[in-house]
Amino acid sequence: MKSQLILTLDDIEEGAVYFHWDNVPGASFYEISYKDSARKSVRYKILDITRERFYCLKKATNREYYVRVRAYGAKKDNERLLIAEGTETTPLYYFPKVQKEDLNRGLIAVKTENGIFLAWRFFKREAAGYSATGLTGIDFRVYRNDKEIAVVTDSCNYLDKEGTDKDVYSVEPVKVGNDGVAEPVSGSRRADSRCENVSVWKSGKNYLEIELSRPEGGVTPAGEHFEYRINDMSVGDVDGDGDYEYIVKWDPTNSQDVSIKGYTGRCILDCYKIDGRLMWRLDMGPNIRAGAHYTQFMVYDFDGDGKAEMAVKTAPGTIMTKFNEDGSIASKSYITMSQIDKAAGFSNEDNYVCSAQDYYDHMVDLFMKWGEHPEVMAGHWPDTLEECFGIEKKYPYPLSKADAAELVDYFMDVYAPGRSAKNELRKFEGFIYDGPEYLTMFAGDGTELETIDYPFPRQDDGLMWGDYALPRIEPCNRVDRFLAGVAYLDGIHPSLIMCRGYYTRSTIAAYDFKEGHFVERFMVDSGHVPMSNPFNDNPHDREGSDKEYGSLSGQGDHSLSIADVDDDGFQEIIYGAACIDHDGRLKYSSYDYLPSGKRAKLGHGDSMHVAKIDPDQPGLQIFNVFEGAKAAPYGYALRDAETGTVRHRFTEDGEDLGPFGFYAETDLGRCMIGDIDPNTKGLQVWVNDVYSCDGMELPLEAPSTNQAIRWAADLSTQVLDRSDYLNGEHRGVVNDITHGVMLDPEDTLCNNGTKGNACLVASVFGDFREDLILRRKDDKAIRIYTNTELTNHKLYTPMDDIMYRVGIAWQNTCYNQTCYTSYYYASDMSFKDIPLVD
């Protein structure tokens, strides 16, 4: 029989709790574990095995943790004997003042068949406790035409059955006393007093329509005409008035994947007020190609002045136009080029987009200088191009221009097509492999604050990045894969994350923005993947040359995620199958074993979800797909976010069924997670089949993997459109297997081809539920759809949850991914697990 082990708290800091325990006679070692919820069903997670009688729990003390220490004695019947056990709850100690936006109440009034539906924001700072259906705290007095009509205590929505579309509404935060009297609250925040009156949405339906100023189309150098479509979006309070503004990316109809040849029109970014007024327009210029991989725009208040900025990769020719309130042009200016580049002869009038002839000439120049390439000089690559191509040496080196041209002809007409019929290098045009690259921070009003060199230059056209090494020769592909994000690396302030590369070399830069300047926090670089022949090799399954970060290469996805994976109060960067700690160190890079027994990286994938998937497991989890097929240990897997290890599946009796990851011989495409089955605990995960968070296959048809949305009043998860994402028109249908179709919008479209993304899924106003922003079919307006079903749940806006808020910032990054709260959000959630302290 085990005895009681007493834990004694010795000290507590912002990020650590120190404790010890008395000696247990006969103890061989002690097992320390913890969990992040008091619920009995939550499993303890082992932290350490030690012979010492003290321990430091390295967790942020802005929440409670439940620590258990077990003493084990000598083995009996080949099992360790548990002889003592003790538990302790760590106290709240740290109350960080996290930098956040000061939003208004976000009240909306929407006409329905039964009256006027109202919904508004509730903030984390206003929450005081828990109820059976949500949170408690501040309540709300509702006004119609400046006359009180209700006091709402159990939610943040209300249906005024007597209201009309001619009425105006406002809400006031109040505190209902024991006597039932509602008294106004006081405070210095924008939402602490009664909000301004709002009118009912003019559409007469459950969407707000914002007319936009569509840019004029154009013609490429190849004579192809293009128009502009509304694409990805972001939100931020750029002028500090408490309302979100809407940043819209305009993609030309000829925007391209980084692997596809051809000219593109210019990418354009607009900023709009909610009434449709255009504040500014950023024309990325000719030297930023249009497509999902090139322009990731991070909108956030980076400097803490109460107004959101925008950070984006720029180039010579990028031009900002600011507008007056009447729509006239206030100013127009190019970005600031570096003095070094200007002295070298570069200018804002330059155009570095290559024609097919430009590319041919570029290759002739490369071949002429072959012997000067650092990899050739170092002996890493063959001395001659003939050896690279597997033919007998024919020419003296260094090559003359004529000889180089002959070899380029051979390369383009014989060698490349011989490796793949898709290698049509004579038609290679529309790419950019030369010229300066910049990173610019713009103020909310469009003013350029600072422009610096992009942290990791391209260096070449992709030769060093492996773009010529595989059978499919794709110059300017791996080298031009960009990601971006926002992370609270110090737990208090937001930092900008800018990245380049993930198939081979992978690079990540982190900046703060202080007093008008970028301030580097850290740089991460895997180094190039060594190749013996840049024209015939496989760089995907190797590590980069850097001793510290080499294993990061090839692990990134077409997006990233930001989360505090180890509960230390600082956010980490989840870079696909790898993770960078808040201080820039490599936290892990996940490997496992192929069926052959060979150890291999989990590798690149198209879809990743970081969330509280299993409510009974401490910390966060990651669900990925991996596209390495036979070369990857898993086609998909559920991993522990803190360690990157693949979780195991267990039966109800505790039998270990092996890893919750399955080998696949083909690329499975995408995956998704969400609460789609009310009868199964935890979030469900799916690719082709649906599984519980414990790894049990469920008898359900897999829903769409396009994009998820928390739309329903019952806290469940919905998806956009159907599971057949390769066929049909995606217009943003919200549905699930429980409720069926919940929203079937008309005259709208989703973006990005088969990916079927909305412009943005985010809780931009109203209560805790997410809103759906779609483009109108004619690309002249956006529509913001909201759910007008009444809910009796009271939760703070997810925009007040830092993990979710930065997720909204990075949602536009490359292959748009769903973002999640730091806590478990589902129809079976325990409201007591929602954090009330930042």
Regions found by a protein language model. Give the residues of each.
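Recognizes extended acidic, P/S/T-rich segments that occur
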Residues: 29-62, 74, 119-166, 177
